[in-house]
Amino acid sequence: MKRTIILFISAIFLLSACGNEDNEKSKEQSNDNKQQEKSGSVKEIATDKNVQGNNYRTILPFKESQARGLLQDNMANSYNGEDFENGLLELSKEVFPTDDYLYQDGQYLDKDTINAYLDPKYTKSEVDAMDEDERKEKKANENLGLNPSHNGETDPEKIAEDSPAYLSNILEQDFYASGDTKGKKIKGMTIGLAMNSTYYYQKEKDGETYSKDLDDKEIKKQGKQMAGEILSRVRENKALKDIPIHFAIYKQTGENSIVPGEFIAGTTVEDGKTRINEWKDINQTTALLPSDEASKIDENLNNNFKQINDDLQTYFNNFTQAVGTVKFDNKKAKQLTVDVPIDYYGEAETIGITQYITEQAEKYFDDIDEYEIRIKDGNKAKALISKTKDDKDPQVHIYKNNN
């Protein structure tokens, strides 16, 4: 089996080669820059290379999301944030193929608007009780909140019982025709709704935090209703009136979870349509390896992972135990991430354990679309073994001079 070992020195040679070519082009680029300065504009282009596999090309210069920062602020834990964004992009690829569309971060739903959507619906008495500044800050006059109304209730415990916040975040992704490198006319949009699975509250300011688990059926029901309302609102924008819009509902894990959540439903609304007629259930599950939960879904994979751990402990004294996170789609393992901790004593040992794990990955993980195995000494990366569904063999990267 062919092995691919990628070393940093290779990257250095590549960069050096590119550098010579860049020097030859520098005068030409300088003239281009001067011309752009004179015209008062920056040339808009699209990236022309996929970094890895089936990825979108992006419009340059890159425009940051109008809601930048909310992904980190509003998710229950960091695992949810990354999984929500990456998973939404994967779902987008099924609707807006990477060969036909360019990608741009969301430009239509800004931070203030999304925050207003995350508020509860206000009653008239609640709006009347606000001063002008508070009304303006919360956009209370527009009353855009999508979460259930508290109906004037102020007791945190009763709110948790009767009208908890289901919607935690909204993420927008925009798509343009492959030839529209200036991003003149949007051709499609994906909107993700991140839902809470647990509602957290305090009975008094700076007091103990309490939690209430939310019902799965109600989470999905609320998400679908909210998506319908968002659709009617974004259709009011002339640019978004006649484009397909894909919606996906994501159920987060709780604050203390070390695994991310999963998408539970999705739908695509065709051009010009203002109502959502049907949804498709998404059957995703994320589990730790090894674990009872993973064993219930794929006992063979769970047992194989245990066997790898046992073998590593037998052959390498400085190995403790690997921990993996696997994402199942319709009970089939699709993505796997593994952290392998070692105590570093020398490069030969790192190479040996990397070679062995690569062999085991080919043996046990070959049916998984994507996997990434990170070999670490504490926080220091020592090696990376990865494979995408486009790779015939695993890609292996041993880090040099990283003692």
What annotation goes with each model-predicted range?
Residues 1-4:
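Positively charged n-region of N-terminal signal peptides that target proteins for export
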Residues 13-17:
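C-terminal motif of bacterial Sec signal peptides marking the signal peptidase cleavage site
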Residues 257-312:
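Surface-exposed beta-loop interaction hotspot
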